Regions:
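C-terminal helical/coil "lid" or tail adjacent to the Rossmann-like core of SAM-dependent
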Residues: 5-8, 13-15, 198-255
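A short acidic, Gly/Pro-enriched loop at the edge of an enzyme's catalytic core
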Residues: 100-109
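Core SAM-dependent methyltransferase catalytic element
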Residues: 190-191, 261-272
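A short glycine-rich, Lys/Arg-flanked "PGG" loop and its adjoining helix->strand segment in the class I
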Residues: 123-138
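Class I SAM-dependent methyltransferase SAM/SAH-binding core
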Residues: 44, 50-99, 124
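Conserved catalytic/acceptor-binding region of the Class I
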Residues: 140-209
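Conserved alpha-helix/loop element of class I SAM-dependent methyltransferases that forms part
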Residues: 22-41, 56
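Helix-to-beta-strand junctions that scaffold the AdoMet/dcAdoMet cofactor pocket
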Residues: 62, 118-119, 133-135
Length: 272
């Protein structure tokens, strides 16, 4: 997802493909059903990226429902239109930090893997998108905790620099490695009702490395390391040495990696 006046940390010519490949449609369906999506609903997928999730949500609401995918990146939306167009789906280019009233009202609003890019504005974004949700409608927030930080089998040196990279991203680039742990508080502070929380592993990687995990993590670490400006002084060849050690670690079948995924859903209060 890219937003006006906000640097999207993963931006590259290959980002639409990365988002497409990493999206597990079975997981999206399971999460949406858990949150309470139903046939006939009008759904907003905010930060829709490549459109794959919007397509799944539209299938779940069926022909009596509809889905609007919203993203600020024209490149993502072009990809979505080319790969995930369908009757009942509309893609719109908008900044979710700005008023969204012209989109109309929705029964179900979905925000997945977006707040991690807005450490300082996350609550304001949730408050803003809540305005397009009908009273009694469902808001579903999904994000990661300890993002990119839970590994076993790596050297102390590699672990040190992975932590340093994420600290730089957090302090200088508004990235939030701990976005998931805050989701419940966002809904609680907006007086949402029937709040439910689910905790599952998002990445659970051990043994032989899947090609999709290899591609996704390679791109994530490459982009974060380069963007951070970290000097990697403990490596004779700097970034190249760091990146090679990460690739060697990640391809080792002994390696164990996971990322906690926190899903939170609630119903918007019905006015008296």
């Amino acid at each position: 997802m890219s937003q006006l006046g906000h640097r999207y940390l993963m931006e590259s010519d290959e980002e639409s493909v990365r988002l497409d490949l990493k999206t597990d449609t079975d997981a999206v369906e399971k999460q949406a059903l858990w949150a309470g999506i139903e046939p006939g609903m009008r759904v907003a997928d905010l930060g829709c990226g490549a459109g794959k999730t919007t397509f799944v949500l539209n299938q779940l609401v069926g022909p009596a429902g509809s889905a609007v995918g919203v993203d600020m990146s024209p490149q993502r939306l072009d990809y979505a239109e080319s790969h995930y167009s369908h009757a009942g789906i509309e893609y719109v280019c908008k900044d979710i930090r700005e008023p969204l009233n012209d989109l109309g009202m929705f029964d179900f609003v979905w925000l997945r893997f977006v707040l991690e890019y807005y450490r300082h504005e996350s609550f304001d974004i949730v408050k803003n998108i809540s305005k397009i949700l009908k009273p009694g409608g469902i808001l579903c927030l999904i994000d990661l905790d300890c993002n990119c930080l839970r590994h076993f089998g790596l050297s102390e040196r590699l672990e040190k620099y992975l932590i340093e990279i994420m600290e730089i991203m957090e302090n200088k680039f508004n990235f939030d490695p701990y976005a998931g742990i805050k989701l419940y508080a966002h809904l609680f502070d907006l007086d949402y009702q029937d709040i439910a929380v689910n905790l599952t592993p998002h990445n659970l990687i051990y043994g032989e490395l899947k090609e999709t995990d290899n591609y996704n993590w390679t791109k994530k670490v490459e982009m974060a390391a380069k963007t951070s400006g970290c000097r990697f002084q403990d490596y004779e060849d700097g970034y190249e040495g760091f990146f090679k050690e990460f690739l060697d670690f990640f391809s080792d079948h002994r390696r164990f990696t996971y990322t906690p995924l926190i899903s939170c859903r609630g119903r918007k209060p019905v006015a008296d």
